[in-house]
Swiss-Prot record:
Function: One of the essential components for the initiation of protein synthesis. Protects formylmethionyl-tRNA from spontaneous hydrolysis and promotes its binding to the 30S ribosomal subunits. Also involved in the hydrolysis of GTP during the formation of the 70S ribosomal complex.
Protein name per its UniProtKB record: Translation initiation factor IF-2
Segments of this protein annotated with the region G1: 110-117
Start and end residues of each stretch annotated as G3: 156-159
Region listing for G5, in residue ranges: 246-248
Lineage: Bacteria, Bacillati, Chloroflexota, Dehalococcoidia, Dehalococcoidales
Chain sites annotated for binding GTP: 110-117, 156-160, 210-213
Length: 593
């Protein structure tokens, strides 16, 4: 960074106005470089001249940043940040202003060992309403607490996977996320995953720094680690409330709940209780004695006993409803979680549920839902140009995975520079390592795609991506990666051919046919086997042969297809060396979207 010097001039000229750069009380080196429109290396050099050693993610305070800004010839100004929750009212919110307030819906997320469950138990034990005798005892996946006369609804999801599964199906169930981080362990990879999912949901985040009772607790380290990934607490000039807690000693619980109420007040959460009920399925199961049972979060309207409801591909009449403490109730207002009985079959988590006027209307809606193919809201490189042209999207969300950490920054910077006035490139998550199931779920939830550079993909992740039609691109050359994205934004990228696995089967026995051909006696494990498909035979994880199937039989009868759970005989063209435990993958190729 070159420090500006003044030069004498023969003429008296009016000096141009000095550019003012506004910053919060704390800023990372990269953010400061972006504000100065310079390379982060130049900022690091400027800091070194002041005796400060820093890396690109280092967070520095305003006074230090001010010195760098002024040395570059600009003026620094401290920006007073407003809470992210205090958003401008949209037309929809203005219409809601006449309706009553509803309880906030909160999800607690974080690393599995950071005390998330114990924190939930502490909240529940000190604030939950007393259970009634004679109700149900099933855990319904949500509960309400009351503090200072105000209710708060907590979704007790097993992890951010369930949270994201709901969003992937178009259901936004949460108003506020509490991110739990242990004060002794600090930020862990699962913490960052949870943070990515919370950010993608676009809801306010409250930081609970838990395990403050531990001797090695270091809350400042937690704040520093989170600041490096863009989550800055209020006391450092950010907009995130940070609450120290100890679930073990029951400390900080009320302060945490008060923080939730503060955010809820700023969000001005309202709903119309008088319209037909609508909500989302947050848990569902087949109860052995009661039949299909669904836990529903009512989001608007009032769900009543006897209502006819539709949820995805099933419907029913509400025969019984139980609240979170097992009490039978006759109605449920907005933000109330209830377990209901009366569905024809078990709905899926994330299904939207709505009350309708008649049974005929319910059946018609189910038929319509069943006939339409469920698709995710994800885009692909092939169709992104059309999506932008049609006004469907204004942002391209990308999950970026590379082989090593050093490859991330140059690829991220190059991709972000491809943003135009019509579409913005967002890197929702970046990291080193294989593409995981969590990456695919984030792509599902954000309507995005995945780009891998010199890295692989986990088997479960590939299966989920195939099932949900998520575009995963693999590259070994950075130039080709950037070129493809650039072409995609201009509508110039040619469609790619991808493999779609239709079904998998395991060889359980081997038979010799009359024509001296080997037939594999198989059990179909998943999907379906289709006659004349291309088949890949795997043995110990290695591909032994890739050949078309020329025989598919059940009980000596030729069949066109065999679905999961059934046995069959399979023959492959010019192949007779089947062995027990071989895996057969039936697949076809198609152009990507």
């Amino acid at each position: 960074m070159v420090e500006k010097t003044s030069k004498p001039s023969a003429k008296t000229e009016v000096a141009p106005p000095v550019k003012i750069i506004e910053l919060g009380a704390a800023v990372s080196v990269k953010e400061l470089a972006d504000s100065l429109e310079t390379n982060p290396v130049e900022v690091i050099k400027a800091l070194m001249r002041k005796g400060i050693m820093a890396n690109i993610n280092q967070v520095i305070d305003f006074d230090i940043a001010k010195g760098v800004i002024e040395a570059a010839g600009f003026e620094a100004k401290l920006k007073i940040l407003k809470k992210s929750a205090a958003k401008k009212a949209s037309p929809a919110k203005e219409k809601l202003s006449n309706f009553p307030l509803r309880p906030p819906v909160v999800t607690i997320m974080g690393h599995v060992d950071h005390g998330k469950t114990r924190l939930l138990d502490a909240i529940r034990s000190t604030n939950v309403m007393e259970k009634e005798v004679g109700g149900i005892t099933q855990h319904i996946g949500a509960y309400q607490v009351e503090i200072k006369g105000h209710k708060i609804t907590f979704l007790d999801t097993p992890g951010h996977e369930a949270f994201t599964a709901m969003r992937a199906r178009g259901a936004q169930a949460t108003d506020i996320t509490i991110l739990v981080v242990a004060a002794d362990d600090g930020v862990m990879p699962q913490t960052l995953e949870a943070l990515d999912h919370a950010k993608a949901a676009g809801v306010p985040i409250i930081l609970a720094i838990n395990k403050m009772d531990k001797p090695e607790a270091n809350p400042d380290r937690v704040k520093q680690q989170l600041a490096e990934v863009g989550l800055v607490v209020e006391e450092w000039g950010g907009d995130t409330l940070a609450i120290p807690t100890s679930a073990r000693e029951n400390k900080g619980i009320n302060e945490l709940l008060e923080a939730v109420l503060l955010i809820a007040e700023l969000e001005d959460l309202r709903a119309d209780p008088n319209q037909p009920a609508s909500g989302v399925v947050i848990e569902a199961e087949m109860d052995k004695t009661k039949g299909p049972m669904a836990t529903v979060l009512v989001q608007s309207g009032t769900l009543k006993l006897g209502d006819t409801v539709v949820a995805g591909n099933t419907w029913g009449r509400v025969k019984a409803m139980f609240n979170d403490v097992g009490k039978r109730i006759k109605k449920a207002e907005p933000s109330t979680p209830v377990a209901l009985l009366g569905m024809e079959s078990v709905p899926q988590v994330g299904d939207k549920i709505i009350a309708v006027a008649t049974e005929k209307q319910a059946r018609d809606m189910v038929n319509e839902n069943s006939q339409s193919t469920r698709k995710t809201n994800a885009v692909s490189l092939t169709n992104v140009y059309d999506q932008v042209s049609q006004g469907n999207i204004k942002e391209l969300n990308i999950i970026l995975k590379t082989d090593v950490q050093g490859s991330l920054e140059p690829i991220k910077d190059s991709l972000e520079k491809l943003s135009t006035d019509k579409i913005k490139i967002n890197i929702n998550r970046s990291g080193a390592g294989n593409v995981t199931e969590s990456d695919v779920m984030l792509a599902m939830a954000s309507g995005g795609l995945i780009i891998g550079f010199s890295t692989g993909i986990e088997t479960n992740a590939q299966r989920l991506a195939d099932a949900e039609d998520i575009d995963i691109r693999h590259y070994d050359i950075i130039y080709k990666l950037i070129e493809d994205v650039d072409k995609a934004l201009q509508g110039l990228l040619e469609p790619t051919i991808k493999e779609v696995i239709d079904g998998r089967a395991e060889v359980r026995a081997v038979f010799e046919s009359t024509k001296k051909l080997s037939i594999a006696g198989c059990m179909v494990l998943e999907g379906k086997l289709v006659k004349n498909s291309q088949v890949r035979l795997l043995r110990g994880g290695e591909v032994i042969v890739d050949a078309p199937s020329n025989s598919l039989r059940r009980f000596k009868e030729d069949v066109k297809e065999v679905v999961a759970g059934y046995e069959c005989g399979v023959g492959l063209k010019d192949f007779n060396e089947f062995q027990k435990s071989d895996i057969l993958e039936f697949y076809h190729k198609e152009k990507s979207r």
